Each structure stands twice: as structure tokens, then as C-alpha cells.
Curated annotation (Swiss-Prot):
Source species: Salmonella typhi
Listed NCBIfam families: PRK09019.1, SUI1_rel
Alphabetized SUPFAM superfamilies for the sequence: eIF1-like
GO terms (BP aspect): formation of translation preinitiation complex; regulation of translation; translation reinitiation
Keyword Protein biosynthesis: yes
Pfam families given in the database record: SUI1 (PF01253)
Protein name: Uncharacterized protein YciH
One GO MF term: mRNA binding
Length: 108
């Protein structure tokens, strides 16, 4: 029944039959947290992107809130990547290393 020409002919159920939704799975990293500075598409304003943290969304949001408070700036969590406004790479690196994470500064 996975043929593209097949269709449901008769059903006693009413309404649409919904497909079960699957949660998006992030690819596993190599265990190293990378901090990258990005300005493209942001009108010259720089942000630090923190990738490679293997946590669920609730823990990432909690960690991002803590980093934003310590850095004194704004930020967001988008698709498993933490964005911190401004160039605070050195401060973020020291904070994450204090939590026992392996951190690398990626990019220039």
C-alpha cells in the first residue's frame, strides 16, 4: 500500500488520519564543543554560535540562559545551536571548560 497510486477507499473512521510525528534527531557529535563567531546575514552584528553540545532542548535552554546571564547579553537556542550575541568567545570558553566540556574555538 505504499504505492503512490493507491489510496484509501473506505474507512469507518471519521476525519483525517494523521501520521505519527517523529521528533527530529540531531546527529551525534564528536564530543567537542565548538564556538564560532558569525556575522553573515546579521547586518554586521556578530554572534557566537556554540555547537556540539549533546543535551536535550530543555537542558540547552537552561545552559543558554546561564551563559547569557554570565555574559550580560542576549541570545537564543535554534535547532540545537546556542547563539550568544557579541564576541564573547573567550568568556564562553572558560565557562564551558569549568563545566567539564572540551571546547575549541572554530574559525578565525
Amino acid at each position: 500500500m505504499s504505492d503512490s497510486n493507491s489510496r484509501l477507499v473506505y474507512s469507518t473512521q471519521t476525519g483525517r488520519i494523521e501520521e505519527p510525528k517523529t521528533a527530529p534527531v540531531r546527529p551525534k557529535g564528536d564530543g567537542i564543543v565548538r564556538i564560532q563567531r558569525q556575522t553573515s546575514g546579521r547586518k554586521g552584528k556578530g554572534v557566537c554560535l556554540i555547537t556540539g553540545i549533546e543535551m536535550n532542548d530543555a537542558e540547552l535552554t537552561k545552559l543558554a540562559a546561564e551563559l547569557k546571564k554570565k555574559c550580560g547579553c542576549g541570545g537564543a537556542v535554534k535547532e540545537g545551536i546556542i547563539e550568544i550575541q557579541g564576541d564573547k568567545r573567550d568568556l564562553i570558553k572558560s565557562l564551558l571548560e569549568a563545566k567539564g566540556m572540551k571546547v575549541k574555538l572554530a574559525g578565525g
